[in-house]
Amino acid sequence: CDYFRDRLNMTLKRFTTDIARTNLHYTVLFRASDEDKYHTLRNLLDSTKCPAIVYVTRTKSAEKIAERLCKDGLNAKAFHGQMEINAKVKAQDEFMSNKVRIIVATSAFGMGVDKSDVGLVVHYEISDSLENYIQEAGRAGRDVNSQAECYVLYNDDDLNKHFILLNQTKLTLSEINQVWSAVKKLTAKHDTIYISALEIA
C-alpha cells in the first residue's frame, strides 16, 4: 500500500482476513479402484443438495464422470481447458446461477469463481501440488457462516498419472539445443531481439 500511496498518489483500502478456514472440513479417503471412487463420489453427492465441484486431472475424466453422473440422474457438467470458450462460459454461468448443481472440472475451473454456497469440493484424484489443492478446496465455504466439506479420493495410480503428465512436459536435450540454436542465430544479427515462444518453436 505504501508504494501506491507514495509513488502513484493512490489511496488503497486494505482488506485483511484470517487465512484459517475453520468452516472447511477435510477428509482423505483411500479407494482401491476407480469404481470404488465413483461410488463414493455418488454417495457424497447424494448426501447433500448444495452446489459441488469435483476436480479431476484430465479432460477425458471430466467428460466421462460428468456424463456418468448425468446418466445416473444428477445435474452435472464438465469444464476443462480444451472446451470452446462459449461452452466454458455457458457451463460456468449455469453453475453460478444454480442451473447446474455439479461441475466436474480440471484445474482450468475456478479462477474468478466466487460462489458462496458451494458446500462440497471433491478431488476425485489428488492435486498436482499442495498450493493447487488449497486453492481448489478453498472454492467451498466462501460463506463463512456455513460449513463445507472437502474430500480427497485417492489410490496408488493417482501419483503415476501425475508422473506421466510431468514426463510429458519435459524437454529433451535435442529440443533444448534447437531452442538455443534459434536464439544464437537471431542474436548474431541483432543486439536485442523480441521473439515469442511460438516463433522459437
Predicted regions and their residues:
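Helicase motor core with emphasis on the C-terminal RecA-like subdomain
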Residues: C1-V183, H190-E199
